[in-house]
């Protein structure tokens, strides 16, 4: 762990955060910013509008971090306690700042309002504090070092105001005061078709690296590995990451589909575009979800021709040429129907590839032999057609089944395109 004197801690003040009434987007923003600046931070605290509990949080944080960043509690109401609590914690008097009063009065005048006594509270800052101007609102922040090795920064809780103050004033101050001793450079590798535990087992030795570090994440069926290097420059960070990325890709093989802002749809689109090939889709249980993923990609009209949502068996028959006999014998949720759907859309639209999805998204409709979460994907291409069965389960709900099915369809197409290379 880094020297605590050079570590930051984010303290978010507001009962509305504790109650879950609003998301703590300020902490998310600041965490990302600190990472980009190369300032380590290991703790985040959320505390309600209570003087005693805020004092307790400050005392704990001041023992383990050298830069305490506060958001919220700078307003004019009695429950806005951040400034006065910090003054009490470090036995400092508050003094009214005339320049803040002037700024608030000017803003009130422009809005046709009159300065009230409670707004004067926002001009009270600890003696010796450096002002953090708030160009967008009436609550300024401050920077203060109450003792050696400890710096306090305060910001209003309004995200737009906080972000502007951070960017325009706080970040330059951090650079000028030698807080940004290195930068963090990251690379995000993306995987599909392998579980987080299986991938972690394959690459376990990499989790012990110190610089760069490797950390796994998983959501919505996708697994990610973030490689992060601390370096003096971006070029140095990229150089540290490159050999690790190469090794990880070699271990994962085709389970690694891309990096950073890549998506399965964008990767598939690039493969189709490079080959001059086209795609059409036929969807049942995903109800257009696959087409939506595809059409979010700019330029997808160059390789995606369209699709059919064949929710009813009559549509499967009339538009996709799925035979009534097959539907009667195998059922709509079957590999053979998925294959016929894929071939049907491929032939109807005249595309290189046809992809289909049919399944039981739930919560109803499952049976003992065909439970909720059972999905079949059909891939029809230049060399033939095949079907894939997936059992996602019912535990995570209908949307989960639909999302994973659309992602899996794209991944099966990606692998098919690569296999023809």
Curated annotation (Swiss-Prot):
Classification via Gene3D superfamilies: 3.30.70.2860, CinA-like, MoaB/Mog-like domain
SMART domains in UniProt: MoCF_biosynth
InterPro entries linked: CinA (IPR050101), CinA-like_C (IPR036653), CinA_C (IPR008136), CinA_KH (IPR041424), Competence-induced_CinA (IPR008135), MoaB/Mog-like_dom_sf (IPR036425), MoaB/Mog_dom (IPR001453)
CDD domains documented for this protein: cinA
Recorded superkingdom: Bacteria
NCBIfam families: cinA_nterm (TIGR00200), PncC_domain (TIGR00199), PRK00549.1 (NF001813)
Family: Belongs to the CinA family.
Protein name: CinA-like protein
Phylogenetic classification of the source organism: Bacteria, Bacillati, Cyanobacteriota, Cyanophyceae, Synechococcales
Name of the encoding gene: cinA
């Amino acid at each position: 762990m880094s020297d605590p004197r050079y570590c930051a801690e984010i303290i978010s003040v507001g009962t509305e955060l504790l109650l879950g009434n609003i998301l703590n987007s300020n902490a998310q923003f600041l965490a990302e910013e600190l990472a980009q600046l190369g300032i380590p931070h290991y703790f985040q605290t959320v505390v309600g509008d209570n003087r005693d509990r805020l004092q307790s949080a400050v005392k704990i944080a001041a023992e383990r971090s050298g830069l305490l960043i506060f958001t919220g509690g700078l307003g004019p109401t009695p429950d806005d306690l951040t400034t006065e609590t910090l003054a009490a914690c470090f036995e400092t008097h508050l003094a009214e700042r005339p320049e803040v009063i002037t700024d608030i009065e000017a803003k009130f005048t422009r809005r046709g309002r009159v300065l009230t006594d409670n707004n004067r509270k926002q001009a009270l800052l600890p003696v010796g504090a450096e002002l953090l101007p708030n160009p967008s609102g009436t609550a300024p922040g401050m920077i203060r070092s109450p003792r050696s090795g400890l710096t306090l920064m305060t910001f209003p809780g309004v995200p737009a105001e906080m972000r502007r103050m951070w960017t325009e004033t706080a970040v330059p101050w951090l650079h000028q005061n030698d807080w940004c001793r290195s930068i963090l450079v990251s690379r995000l590798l993306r995987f599909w078709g392998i579980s987080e535990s299986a991938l972690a087992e394959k690459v376990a030795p990499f989790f012990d690296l110190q610089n760069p570090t490797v950390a796994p994440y998983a959501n919505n069926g996708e697994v990610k590995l973030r490689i992060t290097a601390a370096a003096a420059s971006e070029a140095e960070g990229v150089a540290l990451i490159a050999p690790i990325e190469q090794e990880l890709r070699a271990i994962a093989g085709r389970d690694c589909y891309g990096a950073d802002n890549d998506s399965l749809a964008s990767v598939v689109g690039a493969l189709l575009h490079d080959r001059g090939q086209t795609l059409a889709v036929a969807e049942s249980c995903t109800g257009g979800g696959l087409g939506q993923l595809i059409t979010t990609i700019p330029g997808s009209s160059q390789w995606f021709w369209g699709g059919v949502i064949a929710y009813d068996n009559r549509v499967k028959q009339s538009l996709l040429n799925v035979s009534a006999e097959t539907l009667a014998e195998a059922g709509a949720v079957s590999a053979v129907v998925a294959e016929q759907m894929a071939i049907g859309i491929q032939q109807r639209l005249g595309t290189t590839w046809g992809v289909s999805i049919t399944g039981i998204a739930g919560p109803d409709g499952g049976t003992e032999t065909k439970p909720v979460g059972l999905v079949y994907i059909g891939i029809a291409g230049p060399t033939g057609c095949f079907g894939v069965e997936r059992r996602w389960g019912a535990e995570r709900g209908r949307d989960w089944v639909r999302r994973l099915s659309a992602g899996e369809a794209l991944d099966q197409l990606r692998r098919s395109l690569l296999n023809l290379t």
